[in-house]
């Protein structure tokens, strides 16, 4: 039986007696759930006895002019999906419950790791992620928390947050889930028109081509790497996208300095297609 809580105190009271002999997992979401979210739930169930899914469209991670007001809110449908998936508890608080004072005077800043990739065009986004995730960790006090690898930078920031604030929480990165045609699943995919939806899988196709080049091409320096990146950006833009960024870094998101050792890299991209800002990434091991 799935139980939904709107109040922090009610959820904490339900979880309190379970802590002595149950392992608790948290899956934070903003709702409008798809198969990618359900894969996070299934992974959480493999690692814990009790699964809590939060549904909260967090206003602090939206910038001016972004889609806070239009972001799909589908709590009834989400509840049905989570019930069918066997989730134990849903936490669906109001903005007032999460933030008695708006904007919240306390901030959790991620530092340098939040200032590139998505942070370049969304400079306050990860500050908002930091405060909401910190609050959710404090409210739920999970043993395990599951985040999707589609938001690769966010996952790295959460791991840093857990390490720096000494949370005793295991962070699990869940594999990116794709549609049959290769498009990374996202709640914002519904912003795509029918024509744009047909174009959208090309983003992943171009990443795959770049990944193969990175595996097969001897790269001696950053100049050669940037030439491959710029060529891929041009191809993506020519396909109808507007690239926000495309970067290749080490898988911890640090800058590549060793071009001769084992490649443990990640390609990360954000690109606009119509009204949809699409994120994707591919890990390169070779």
Curated annotation (Swiss-Prot):
It holds the Pfam family Pantoate_ligase. The keyword Ligase applies. GO terms for biological process: pantothenate biosynthetic process. The keyword Nucleotide-binding applies. The active site is at 37 (proton donor). Its main location: cytoplasm. Pathway: Cofactor biosynthesis; (R)-pantothenate biosynthesis; (R)-pantothenate from (R)-pantoate and beta-alanine: step 1/1. (R)-pantoate binds at residues 61, 154. SUPFAM superfamilies: Nucleotidylyl transferase (SSF52374). GO terms for molecular function: ATP binding; pantoate-beta-alanine ligase activity. Beta-alanine binds at residue 61. Its EC number is 6.3.2.1. It catalyses: (R)-pantoate + beta-alanine + ATP = (R)-pantothenate + AMP + diphosphate + H(+). It is an enzyme of class 6 (ligase). GO terms for cellular component: cytosol. It is found in: Cytoplasm. Keywords: ATP-binding, Cytoplasm, Ligase, Nucleotide-binding, Pantothenate biosynthesis. ATP binds at residues 30-37, 148-151, 177, 185-188. The reaction proceeds by a bi uni uni bi ping pong mechanism. Homodimer. HAMAP family: PanC. Catalyzes the condensation of pantoate with beta-alanine in an ATP-dependent reaction via a pantoyl-adenylate intermediate. Belongs to the pantothenate synthetase family. This is Pantothenate synthetase. The lineage of its organism: Bacteria, Pseudomonadati, Pseudomonadota, Gammaproteobacteria, Moraxellales.
């Amino acid at each position: 039986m799935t139980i939904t809580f709107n109040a922090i105190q009610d959820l904490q009271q339900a979880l309190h007696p379970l802590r002595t002999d149950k392992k608790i997992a948290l899956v934070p979401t903003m709702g409008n759930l798809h198969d990618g979210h359900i894969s996070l739930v299934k992974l959480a169930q493999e690692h814990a006895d009790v699964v809590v899914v939060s549904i909260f469209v967090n206003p602090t991670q939206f910038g001016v002019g972004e889609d806070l007001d239009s972001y799909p809110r589908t709590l009834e449908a989400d509840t049905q999906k989570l019930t069918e998936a066997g989730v134990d508890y849903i936490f669906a608080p109001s903005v007032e419950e999460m933030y008695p004072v708006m904007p919240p005077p306390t901030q959790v800043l991620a530092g340098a790791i939040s200032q590139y990739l998505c942070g370049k065009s969304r400079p306050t986004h990860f500050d908002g992620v930091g405060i909401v995730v910190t609050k959710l960790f404090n409210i739920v006090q999970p043993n395990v928390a599951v985040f999707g690898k589609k938001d690769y930078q966010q996952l790295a920031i959460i791991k840093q947050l857990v390490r720096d604030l000494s949370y005793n929480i295991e962070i699990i990165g869940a594999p990116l889930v794709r549609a049959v045609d290769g498009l990374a699943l996202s709640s914002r995919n519904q912003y795509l028109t029918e024509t744009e939806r047909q174009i959208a899988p090309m983003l992943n196709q171009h990443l795959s081509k770049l990944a193969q080049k990175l595996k097969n091409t001897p790269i001696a320096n950053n100049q050669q790497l940037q030439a491959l990146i710029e060529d891929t950006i041009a191809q993506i833009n020519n396909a109808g996208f507007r690239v926000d960024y495309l970067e290749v870094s080490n898988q911890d998101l640090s800058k590549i300095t060793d071009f001769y050792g084992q490649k443990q890299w990640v390609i990360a991209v954000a690109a606009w297609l119509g009204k949809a800002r699409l994120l994707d990434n591919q890990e390169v091991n070779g």
